Amino acid sequence: MSFPYSLKPFNTFGVEQSCLSMIEVHSKAELQSTCLSLYQSKRPMLVLGGGSNIVFTDDFNGTVVRVLTKGISCSEDGTHFYLAVEAGENWHELVQFSLNQNMPGLENLALIPGTVGAAPIQNIGAYGVELCDICDWVEYLDLESGNLLRLTTDECEFAYRESIFKGSLRDKAVITAVGLRLPKAWHPKLAYGPLQSFNAETVTSREIFDRVCEVRSEKLPNPEELGNAGSFFKNPIVSAATYMQLAAHFPSIVGYAQPNGEVKLAAGWLIEHAGLKGFALGNAGVHAKQALVLVNLGHATGQDICRLALHVIARVNEVFGVKLEAEPRIMGLTGETSLDV
C-alpha cells in the first residue's frame, strides 16, 4: 500500500512512509477546526510537530495534521518572566529567543529537537532540568467537547517522560500553546556530567547553553546526515537496593539519586556495556558515539528500527536485569502501536 503524501521529510528518522492526506495549519483557529472535524469524522488523525519523536512502521491510513502555528508573547512581574508560546514554535529557537531576551532558565534544554507543543507530552528534559520545572500551564483542545482548556503544571501529572497527555488525555487532546514561568532570581543547574566543571558563582546562562550545544552536537548525529530521534530509550529508574546490587557487580555504573530515594540509571551506559555501541541490525544501528541513540544507516524501515530496539532491550535485560523502555511513539497503519510490530 502506498499513499500520496510522503512522510519522509517530516520524521527525523527519515523513514520512507506515506499518508492518505496531509493538512498544514498556521493558526490556532485552523488547528481547532481541522482537528475537531477529523475527530468527529472518526477518521485516523495524527497531529505532528517536528516528527522528532516518532517511528513510522507502516503507511498511515489517515490524515496527518502538521502544526505550524507561531507566536511568543512575554510578560513579567516582580519575580518571574512569563512566556506564552504557540504549539508550532521550534523548541530550540525558543531557548535561543529567551536567552536573547535576557530570560535565562531554558539553557539546559538547548538543542532538544521538536516543537513546543510536543514538549509537555513526554515532559522533555536534559542535564537536570525538565519541562515541568519551568512550565506554568498547558492549553489544549478538548476533542470531545471542542473547547480550549488550560491545565496547571500540577494538573498535567508530569513525571519522568510522562504526562496526562500520554495517560487519560491520550488521543483526546491537542496541545495548542504552552506557558512558561522563569524565575528572575536565576540559579544555574549544574548537577549533570559536562556542566559539573562550571563554578555556580560565576557561570552564565550563555556558557551553559554553549556547553550543552557543544556536547549534544558531539554525541547526537544531525538527522539530516544520519536519521535518528535523539535518545531512543528512557533512563530506567530502579530501587536503591537494585542499584547497590548492580554497583557491586559493575562498579563504574552511572546512576543519579532521585528525590524519592530511587536511582535513575544512564541507559546509554547500560547499552554500551552490554556490548552494543556501534552494533547494527540490517540498516538500523546503535550510534557509535552515543549508545542511547538509534540511527538509520541508509534505508532502514520503521520495522528495522523496532527490531533493533527490541534486541537492545533484550540484551540489556539479559546482562543487567533492567528493562529499557522506548521514548518515541511507534506509529502504525491507523495509529499508535507497540514496538512488537
Curated annotation (Swiss-Prot):
UniProt catalytic activity: UDP-N-acetyl-alpha-D-muramate + NADP(+) = UDP-N-acetyl-3-O-(1-carboxyvinyl)-alpha-D-glucosamine + NADPH + H(+)
One MF term in the entry's GO annotations: FAD binding
UniProt xrefs under Gene3D superfamilies: 3.30.465.10, UDP-N-acetylenolpyruvoylglucosamine reductase, C-terminal domain, Uridine Diphospho-n-acetylenolpyruvylglucosamine Reductase, domain 2
Pathway terms, separated by semicolons: Cell wall biogenesis; peptidoglycan biosynthesis
Required cofactor(s): FAD
EC number from the UniProt entry: 1.3.1.98
Keywords: Cell cycle, Cell division, Cell shape, Cell wall biogenesis/degradation, Cytoplasm, FAD, Flavoprotein, NADP, Oxidoreductase, Peptidoglycan synthesis
Chief subcellular location: cytoplasm
GO biological process, one term: regulation of cell shape
Residue intervals of the FAD-binding PCMH-type domain: 13-185
InterPro entries listed in its UniProt record: FAD-bd_PCMH, FAD-bd_PCMH-like_sf, FAD-bd_PCMH_sub1, FAD-bd_PCMH_sub2, MurB, MurB_C, MurB_C_sf, Oxid_FAD_bind_N
Transmembrane segments: none
Class in the EC hierarchy, top level: oxidoreductase
Catalytic-site annotation from UniProt: R161, S231, E327
GO cellular component: cytosol
Lineage top rank: taxon: Bacteria
Localization, UniProt: Cytoplasm
NCBIfam families linked to this entry: murB, PRK00046.1, PRK13903.1
Described function: Cell wall formation.
HAMAP family found in the cross-reference section: MurB
Family (UniProt): Belongs to the MurB family.
The protein, known as: UDP-N-acetylenolpyruvoylglucosamine reductase
Species name: Shewanella sp. (strain MR-7)
Upper taxonomic lineage: Bacteria, Pseudomonadati, Pseudomonadota, Gammaproteobacteria, Alteromonadales
